[in-house]
Amino acid sequence: MSIGWKEWNRSDIKYGIIVPIIVVLVIAGLSWVSSFLMRSGGMTGSSGIIIGIINTIEELTITVAVPLLLGLVWNRWAGGASGFLMGTVWSMWYAVKYGLYSVFAGGQSARAFNLGPTLLGWVLSAMLIGYMAGALNKHSQNFRRMLIVGIGTTAVGGFFLLGMFQLSPSNVVPFDFYGFVLNVATRIAAGALVAIIAKVFMWYGVNFHKTGTA
């Protein structure tokens, strides 16, 4: 039975309007903070650390959390497709944010930075995480399975991305302990967190369904 146009409640306002607006404002605020720090202090000292943390949070949210969540709660196609889209969006945003496609005074393009493998790695890694999550979880609501899938897929995606970084002539992330922590360990932590969030989403969904049909 479909919902009529007069059937509204507080949850619709809360989760349909307020929460999405808060999320986009937080993202916009983080972007503004990064731009402000870049103009004032650059990438040195405490400003560089803060910019790095913000950049990592944004990257993990877009290229890991979204495709992994859709893969866990929906299916492999939703996870893979969202991973492709989110990875593409992040790659484009990264290129625009750091002016990688600007043109120098002599007419020489900044594409000389040779970050093609890096940008492609973000797209493929996000797509891989989302697709594998859906294929391995298979709509399961068992938390242990979701946690194992979340940790396993993000570890695979992290190692794949780290390997793609090594193919870039302008690679700034070496294949060492630092690179592991930055690309793999952070993704594994995000995978565990997203598994918890996915379980909460499923739990609320099941209870909402039971309440509505009672």
Annotated model-derived regions:
Residues 14-31:
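Alpha-helical transmembrane segments
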Residues 63-64, 82-87, 122-126:
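Mid-membrane cores of alpha-helical transmembrane segments in multi-pass membrane proteins
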Residues 1-13, 17:
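N-terminal signal-anchor transmembrane helix
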Residues 78-91, 145-155:
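Central hydrophobic cores of alpha-helical transmembrane segments
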Residues 55-83, 132:
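Generic transmembrane alpha-helix motif of multi-pass integral membrane proteins
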Residues 12-19, 69, 142-147:
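Alpha-helical transmembrane segments and their helix-start/interface "positive-inside/aromatic belt" motifs
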Residues 3-7, 28-57, 98-102, 106-214:
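Membrane-embedded alpha-helical hairpins and interfacial helices in multi-pass inner-membrane proteins
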